[in-house]
């Protein structure tokens, strides 16, 4: 099997390569090839593969020699080569981090700890397009998959606290630049214990509203603020990110024909690479909290139920704790005042791992027959 990698140098691609190295995945790949859009003929990264030269990612004939293509190059790349590649007669596996093909009928959204049955059926039935899901959707399902898999959810609403990484590497840099720029405005005043906090606050507020604040990528301040809209405006009051929550969750679960209603608001906050979500669920039956926790904890190897206590919550349910790990903690689980079927939950997950690279890494192994 020849496996071609495109977009392996970008943020998601780099995380994917690191994870594949950690898990010794290249030992399961008979022949690996690396493609580029900008450095054709250059030296390929060395993961022990025979092919040492970078190939042209826009050359359909070269791509067509692959049995599997894994791309983290983005949606524009997918739109530019995918159909031409299929039209050339190529019948290989296309594994893609971008959203372009997610909702196509001949594509499966990959999240094997949650929908391995859907993946296995797809492989049996000749499906060749395996697409990574929206990061918040994947992270929500990793945390709450037990309830969805047992068909216990009547509806759910997710209010998100999404990290800068979801918008890209430049946006992560801009967040840090913003933090530093805010501090620089008031560094001297902060160093004076007798300084007025109201004066400091006014200087910060004035700076956030000024044209000097670095906001070329987000368009508005994030450090010291938040952004209550993510992705394009669908024109009906909903953002595309919010729309994805319902349609992608149901597609992942194989329930597009009989969907569970899921909606909410998506908000960008000043976290680096962990998305958090506050979720309200209406269950189909009134279950004890202890039973709900047992169902959640048993769903996969990465979800971690955090006791609904202050100390556990503030130490375990934060981006600072979770970033860079595969752990998906879920806590703040309790009955809400509206009735016994109404449950709250709060979950955190790394947007670049289970939110992006890890499902692709694992579906590659599944397609190769080694997971």
Curated annotation (Swiss-Prot):
NCBIfam families: asd_gamma, PRK06598.1. It comes from the Bacteria. HAMAP family: ASADH (MF_02121). Belongs to the aspartate-semialdehyde dehydrogenase family. Keywords: Amino-acid biosynthesis, Diaminopimelate biosynthesis, Lysine biosynthesis, Methionine biosynthesis, NADP, Oxidoreductase, Threonine biosynthesis. NADP(+) binds at residues 9-12, 37-38, 73, 165-166, 193, 351. Pathway: Amino-acid biosynthesis; L-lysine biosynthesis via DAP pathway; (S)-tetrahydrodipicolinate from L-aspartate: step 2/4; Amino-acid biosynthesis; L-methionine biosynthesis via de novo pathway; L-homoserine from L-aspartate: step 2/3; Amino-acid biosynthesis; L-threonine biosynthesis; L-threonine from L-aspartate: step 2/5. This is Aspartate-semialdehyde dehydrogenase. Substrate binds at residues 162, 241, 268. Its EC number is 1.2.1.11. InterPro entries: Asp-semialdehyde_DH_CS, Asp_ADH_gamma-type, Asp_semialdehyde_DH, NAD(P)-bd_dom_sf, Semialdehyde_DH_NAD-bd, Semialdhyde_DH_dimer_dom. PROSITE patterns: ASD. The active site is at residues 135, 275. It comes from Neisseria meningitidis serogroup B (strain ATCC BAA-335 / MC58). One of its GO terms (biological process) is diaminopimelate biosynthetic process. One of its GO terms (molecular function) is aspartate-semialdehyde dehydrogenase activity. Phosphate binds at residues 102, 244. The gene is asd. Catalyzes the NADPH-dependent formation of L-aspartate-semialdehyde (L-ASA) by the reductive dephosphorylation of L-aspartyl-4-phosphate. Homodimer. It catalyses: L-aspartate 4-semialdehyde + phosphate + NADP(+) = 4-phospho-L-aspartate + NADPH + H(+).
């Amino acid at each position: 099997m020849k496996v071609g990698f495109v977009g392996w140098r970008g943020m998601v691609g780099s995380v994917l390569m690191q994870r594949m190295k950690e898990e010794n995945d290249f030992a399961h790949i008979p022949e690996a090839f690396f493609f580029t859009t900008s450095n054709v003929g250059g030296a390929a990264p060395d993961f022990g593969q025979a092919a040492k030269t970078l190939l042209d990612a826009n050359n359909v004939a070269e791509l067509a020699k692959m049995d599997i293509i894994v791309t983290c190059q983005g949606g524009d790349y997918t739109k530019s080569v995918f159909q031409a590649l299929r039209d050339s007669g190529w019948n290989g596996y296309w594994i893609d981090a971008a959203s372009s093909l997610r909702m196509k009928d001949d594509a499966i959204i990959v999240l094997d700890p949650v929908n391995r049955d859907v993946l296995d059926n797809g492989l049996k039935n000749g499906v060749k397009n395996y697409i990574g899901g929206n990061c918040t959707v994947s992270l929500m399902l990793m945390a709450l998959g037990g309830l969805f898999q047992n068909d216990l959810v009547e509806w759910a609403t997710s209010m998100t606290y999404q990290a800068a990484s979801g918008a890209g590497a430049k946006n992560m840099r801009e967040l840090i630049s913003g933090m530093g720029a805010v501090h620089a405005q008031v560094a001297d005043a902060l160093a004076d214990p007798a300084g007025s906090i109201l004066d400091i606050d006014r200087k910060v507020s004035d700076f956030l509203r000024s044209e000097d604040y670095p906001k070329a990528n987000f368009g508005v301040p994030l450090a010291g603020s938040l952004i209550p809209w993510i992705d394009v405006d669908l024109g009906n009051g909903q953002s595309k990110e919010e729309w994805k929550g319902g349609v992608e969750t149901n597609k992942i679960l194989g329930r597009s024909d009989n969907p569970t209603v899921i909606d909410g608001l998506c908000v960008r906050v000043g976290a680096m690479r962990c998305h958090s979500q506050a979720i309200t669920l209406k269950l189909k039956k009134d279950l004890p909290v202890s039973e709900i926790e047992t169902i959640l904890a048993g769903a996969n190897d990465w979800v971690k139920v955090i006791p609904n206590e202050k100390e556990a919550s503030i130490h375990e349910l934060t981006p600072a704790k979770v970033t860079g790990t595969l752990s998906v903690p879920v806590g703040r689980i309790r009955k809400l005042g509206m009735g016994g079927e109404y449950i709250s939950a709060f979950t955190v997950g790394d947007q670049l791992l289970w939110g992006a690279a890890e499902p692709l890494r694992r579906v590659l192994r599944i397609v190769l027959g080694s997971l």
